[in-house]
Structures are given as structure tokens and as C-alpha cells.
């Protein structure tokens, strides 16, 4: 639950909570570094708290470089079992555009900045489709420099584009079970 997590983290009501994530971590170092740099600029303008989840597969050296930047308001970790709670509690998500993260963004509806991994066609395609359903902005390589990124973050924190909840059915498992039950029943009848 997002409100409970905000209480656990002792976030003040005026503090903006930002969650940055790199999926598995193999290709997220540049973005995570830029997010931390941008948040250093942003905290001069407003009170923020940053949680960075690098993913379990980020190179050890890269992870060490990031964790060297831990502060009271910036915490860098590999992962959390409560990622959905963190997104639900967040005022903003900054991430790559991997499948799991995008599905989590759809469920939590948190305003998001996504930087699709350009070496995979699916991430830009997915992000382009999902941005029509959420308060989301797609970033390019120029956008992830610290100054423009901090400006994009500030903009979305203060003026998220409100969109109607998407008409997405998140009950895939139960729908599949119902379909299989129906299919098996039909197969038995037709035997």
C-alpha cells in the first residue's frame, strides 16, 4: 500500500517521492546516473526523496559507483520485493521501458518518464502505445542530460497530464482459466 509505505519512509506531505528503476540492470547505468545528477539539481527547488532500484544484473563496479552516492534522501539498492508499493507511493517514476515496468506503470498509474532502450524495437513501441494511457513522457538521449532531465521531472511532478483510467483488463490469469474451462467443456460435448 502506497500510503503505508510513505509513512514507513517518514515522507513529509510536501516531499516529492521519486522512484527510478533499471529493470534487470544490464543497461540502466547511464539513466540511473543521470537521474541522480538531475535530482541533485532538483532538490535545490523542492524537497525530494529518491529511491533507485538498479536491478540485480547491474555490473558490480557500476553498482558501487551509484551506491557511493547514497545520502539520507537518495537511496540506491539493487531491488525490492515491494516494488509495486514503491510505485504506488511515488509521485514520479523514471525508468527504462521494459515490459514488467510498463505493466506496473499501467497498474499504479504513477506519472512516468521512460527512456526506451533503443537497441530493442519493442521498448519504443511499447512506450509509445502506453503513453496514450498514462501521464507519461518518452525521453531521448538529449533529455537524459542532468539539466533537461531535472526540468522534465519538475514539470511532471507539478503538472502531470491527467488521463482517464485505461480500459485495460488486468485479469489475464482468470480470463485464461475461464477460456480453458469453456474450451474443455466444448471439447467434451463435441466428442
Residue ranges and their predicted role:
Residues 21-22, 53, 95-96, 114-117, ...:
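Thr-Gly-centered strand-to-loop micro-motif
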Residues 29, 61, 84, 103, ...:
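Alpha-helical elements of the RecA-like P-loop NTPase motor core of helicases
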Amino acid at each position: 500500500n502506497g500510503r503505508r509505505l510513505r509513512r514507513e519512509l517518514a515522507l513529509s506531505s510536501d516531499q516529492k517521492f521519486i522512484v527510478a528503476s533499471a529493470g534487470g540492470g544490464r543497461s540502466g547505468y547511464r539513466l540511473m546516473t543521470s537521474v541522480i545528477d538531475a535530482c541533485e539539481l532538483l532538490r535545490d527547488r523542492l524537497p525530494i526523496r529518491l529511491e533507485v532500484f538498479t536491478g540485480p544484473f547491474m555490473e558490480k563496479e557500476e553498482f558501487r559507483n551509484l551506491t557511493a552516492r547514497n545520502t539520507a534522501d537518495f537511496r540506491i539498492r539493487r531491488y525490492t520485493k515491494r516494488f509495486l508499493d514503491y510505485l504506488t507511493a511515488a509521485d514520479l517514476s523514471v525508468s527504462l521501458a521494459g515490459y514488467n515496468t510498463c505493466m506496473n506503470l499501467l497498474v499504479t498509474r504513477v506519472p512516468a518518464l521512460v527512456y526506451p532502450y533503443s537497441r530493442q524495437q519493442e521498448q519504443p513501441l511499447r512506450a509509445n502505445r502506453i503513453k496514450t494511457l498514462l501521464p507519461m513522457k518518452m525521453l531521448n538521449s538529449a533529455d537524459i542530460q542532468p539539466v533537461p532531465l531535472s526540468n522534465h521531472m519538475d514539470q511532471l511532478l507539478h503538472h502531470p497530464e491527467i488521463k482517464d483510467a485505461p480500459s485495460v483488463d488486468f485479469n489475464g490469469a482468470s480470463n485464461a482459466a475461464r477460456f480453458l474451462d469453456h474450451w474443455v467443456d466444448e471439447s467434451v460435448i463435441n466428442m
